[in-house]
Design a protein with these regions (language model features):
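Short, flexible loop segments at the rims of nucleotide/cofactor-binding pockets, characterized by
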Residues: 48, 209-215
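Active-site adenylate/phosphate-handling loop in enzymes that bind or generate adenylated species
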Residues: 14, 203, 213, 220-221
Length: 221
């Protein structure tokens, strides 16, 4: 896709190419070997959260880059660019810019609601998740009952919370305020520290590579 939101991996072989949305699906084929080379190790330790576009971490594994398509034939693989983000001079004023940004966000959220699985929205207590949930409720004709929301918290977090430069306030009260305002059926999922540790292996298997530690584990739970 244009922005690489939904990944597509590929692995050239002697007789063709394997492709899937997850590395584990490719490595289920005996023709693919999950081997880390020097380049993959560098990606793993230096660029885990912002990997090089197209790099699949494992040797021989590649990822289709945002805005690109691939063509396979007997001569190998060719990357075709079908879309690229262009930087242009911004002429609109603040009011028009805000209206346009709101329109684009509403359209983007509405498109994501087209799904063959139950809908849901994670409320973190921040601006992003609150705004997305509000746009989603509006796209569902204002029927907040159709958008269950949930937040993740830890036992005793409110009593023992200490502000940091990365997190100045406790998330849960703000998530609850957003849910009350929108009228969504809300659930707070309490995750004990031992549950986070117990899920490390499952989280790694789900991601196919190391990630954000306890953050990934809490989202998985």
């Amino acid at each position: 896709d244009r922005f690489g939101v939904k990944p597509l991996y590929y692995y050239p072989t002697a007789g063709g190419v394997l492709f899937a949305s997850e590395p584990k699906a490719i490595f289920a084929n005996p023709e693919a070997n999950p081997v880390l080379d020097a380049s993959g190790i560098a990606e793993l330790f230096a660029l885990t959260t912002a990997p090089t576009p197209g790099h699949g971490l494992y040797k021989g594994l590649r990822q289709v880059r945002p805005g690109q398509a691939l063509r396979f034939d007997r001569n190998g693989v060719r990357e075709l660019v079908y879309w690229a983000l262009r930087a242009e001079r911004h002429e609109e004023g603040a009011e028009d810019s805000a209206e346009r940004a709101g329109q684009l966000l509403r359209e983007a959220v509405a498109e994501q609601l087209v799904a063959d699985v139950p809908l849901g929205s994670l409320l973190s207590g921040g601006l992003d998740s609150s705004a997305i949930s509000a746009f989603a409720v509006a796209a569902l004709d204002g029927d907040a009952r159709r958008l269950p929301t949930f937040s993740v918290d830890f036992p005793g977090e409110g009593r023992g919370f200490v502000p940091t430069p990365w997190q100045s306030s406790w998330d849960e009260p703000y998530a609850q305020l957003a849910a009350n305002f929108l009228g969504t059926p809300h659930r707070t999922v309490l995750v004990a520290p031992e549950e986070v540790l117990e899920q490390d292996e499952a989280v790694l298997q789900a991601r196919d590579l190391p990630g954000w530690g306890e953050l990934d584990a809490s989202l998985y739970l």
